Amino acid sequence: MSLIRRSNVFDPFSLDLWDPFDGFPFGSGGSSSGSIFPSFPRGASSETAAFAGARIDWKETPEAHVFKADVPGLKKEEVKVEVDDGNILQISGERNKEQEEKTDQWHRVERSSGKFLRRFRLPDNAKPEQIKASMENGVLTVTVPKEEAKKPDVKSIQISG
């Protein structure tokens, strides 16, 4: 079993392109050090792929439901937390990035964008009107308080006789 994540050719956010000339002395310059062609950085593609596959964990504590989303590089203005139909928590984000590089020989502008949207049906004991969200170091934390569990009303019955 392999633990290495493979890219999917049909996934628009999977931008790990195969270079058939990589490793040849006169290849396209992707990672070959002996290439005569300029090397272009590929950092934006891995950032876009990481963003598109935003990981969200849902943990239930005695007091609340806690959602933690990894959204590296996003500002809080680029993330939305919404409640739809009273019990659907929706977490979404969008990033548009432009990187420009100029030299005497060439001018390159690379644009990348990505979106994610995740929806969760909240359980009946959730209080959607009291949801709080915070963001720190690329991690969005959404806390949904829970209603207190109703204790059963137990009534003692005397036994006659």
UniProtKB/Swiss-Prot annotation:
GO CC entries: nucleus
User: What processes does the entry annotate via GO biological process terms?
Assistant: protein complex oligomerization; protein folding; response to heat; response to hydrogen peroxide; response to salt stress
**What Pfam families would the database entry show?**
HSP20
Limits of the sHSP domain: 47-161
Cited PROSITE patterns: SHSP
Induction text:
By heat shock.
- Enumerate the UniProt keywords alphabetically: Host-virus interaction, Nucleus, Stress response
The primary location reported for this protein is nucleus
Locations listed in the record: Nucleus
For molecular function, the Gene Ontology terms on record are: unfolded protein binding
**SUPFAM superfamilies attached to this UniProt entry:** HSP20-like chaperones (SSF49764)
Q: Which family does it belong to?
A: Belongs to the small heat shock protein (HSP20) family.
Subunit structure of this chain's protein = May form oligomeric structures. Interacts with the rice stripe virus movement protein pc4.
Q: What is the protein name for this chain?
A: 17.9 kDa class I heat shock protein
Could you tell me which species this protein originates from? Oryza sativa subsp. japonica
